[in-house]
Amino acid sequence: MADHRLVAVILEVSDLDSSVALYRDAFGLDLHPGNNAVDDRWTGGSHAEISWTEGAYLHFSLYPAKEQPTSGVQISLSVDNIESAHAAAVSACARVLHEPRNELWGRSGRYADFDGNVIELTQHT
């Protein structure tokens, strides 16, 4: 059987600059500007991106929405300290869906971006 792996998450957002600032300040993702000079509805044009190459490769991008922004997606980020991560999210004006609480896998808080996507911050125990 083929080894299929998730390698990219791409969200279309209503305001790229504001979203880049939120993901940086609230969630610690240092997105870098990118510009793919291709005529492709999904991957062409200006955007912001970050890739993790240690362990399994994963790429995350924000693109300006060409029609409706992506919504209803949940991504989860592992953090070392949920309380300080929560404080950073609140300080950056992320909308708190629920404050850090005990879950089966550790402590998690959930937040929404400007387009309604959910960002879970989790400290695994």
Q: What does each model-identified segment do?
A:
Residues 46-48, 73, 105-109:
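Short beta-strand micro-motifs in enzyme catalytic cores
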Residues 22, 83-88:
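Short amphipathic alpha-helices within nucleic acid-binding modules
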Residues 33, 56, 60-65, 98, ...:
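Acetyl-CoA-dependent GNAT
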Residues 2, 8, 86-125:
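Vicinal oxygen chelate
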